[in-house]
């Protein structure tokens, strides 16, 4: 038995024994301290079954606290503080940690007093370092026998707390890193190059693999996000979406383990209902995904640009008129397979353009309508066009440095998929512009980040992506920041403000839109309609077919209404 597991079992009464020593009815999952909690012998037996792949959770920030793990190291703690909130590798490679500060719950973080005991809080009690289907099957069997909560974590980029849970046994998919290039995938629904990716493959690894074979693949703007996990299962927007659709549109196969331990492959023609649900219906809900096979696209040159402008020469009113015009000009640009990802503040806009296949002359032509409009308003923008020889080079030019990128992380995220029709109509475009303007003036939630796309006509097998994506043009989210100098009560109030004030404001200004289920607030009340729309009833039928006992629970996931997390963190039947 690994020393870490032995140490954890010895500390179980102090580190995680936070509940009273009582039995709880089967309607609730057990927690450490309950009489029904698995014994040390049970956990050791599971570890043997898993060939030593069971990890006792020891939070990274235990180095910042003097008890109970005995790892206090002031210098290591200072180093951890400097990288704690960065969306690169600090939490990605940690078995039990998650990135969202509001789900860290102040239980064991670098910013509290060293005398405060390091407690697991919302973190899982144990983690399975999954190496294949057999590990998942053994963990699911153990969890159901002992009534232990199951969670699934890949990289921990998770705004809604789906990948963690108090007292849980976590399936850590992060080290399933296999990649396979398929030169000519053949199926009734697709013939061409493809890639089979293990569940733990991150964006930067998928991009490198595709690049090495002369291809590109649809993935996210943060390169440390796991491309196979909740990203694609929830839809997956990309700077390539206007050319190839969202990530879910590109999936050819899902390899999974179901709640009852079956090892299945789901495609548009085999277990097609499960394929449909996994392709847009959200991660952690229907089955445990081991791998994904997705389309690759032939690589080539990619035009790019930095485009920025502000109100310094023309005043704020003219600046906002220019923002409205920028949006009105986007449809033609996007329909050519191009995109902008950009941020909008109260007095400046900064955009990065992606134009697949565009040489320098084409880049200049594509930018001309935007530049002419700005010139007509007396605005001189910053424009830095360039042409990259391939997509990998383009991506890391604008979203690098390679391999981990520099994406900031904002835990209080709301989002809105804004219909194209609202920005092409001058009257409703003015309402959308007012929305941008109002949110940009809320200090803790500015700037407004947006990705633009056109995916209405992209070929794809039937999937469960919210229909609003097909009629949408923008996905926008305010940047809700965390402040470790503020009190927990102040941060909780900020969280509620995002859900109860900002999101309704965004909804009201954009009728016909929806909320992206991967980038949303966990307190949002209207999640069922906004995340899933008319697909929900069918998704629920698939959920009940493949997980009739609701083994898999994630906040705001399909079927999650049958569960509730109480004030102590215990998961109970609603």
From Swiss-Prot:
Gene Ontology CC terms, in alphabetical order: extracellular region
Chief subcellular location: secreted
Pfam families: BBE (PF08031), FAD_binding_4 (PF01565)
InterPro entries: BBE, FAD-bd_PCMH, FAD-bd_PCMH-like_sf, FAD-bd_PCMH_sub2, FAD-linked_Oxidoreductases_BP, Oxid_FAD_bind_N
Top-level taxon: Eukaryota
Cofactor comment: Binds 1 FAD per subunit in a bicovalent manner.
Keywords noted in UniProt: Disulfide bond, FAD, Flavoprotein, Glycoprotein, Oxidoreductase, Secreted, Signal
Residues carrying a glycan: 47, 105, 129, 211, 310, 346, 438
Record PTM: The FAD cofactor is bound via a bicovalent 6-S-cysteinyl, 8alpha-N1-histidyl FAD linkage.
Similarity comment text for this entry: Belongs to the oxygen-dependent FAD-linked oxidoreductase family.
Protein name (database record): VAO-type flavoprotein oxidase VAO615
Originating species: Thermothelomyces thermophilus (strain ATCC 42464 / BCRC 31852 / DSM 1799)
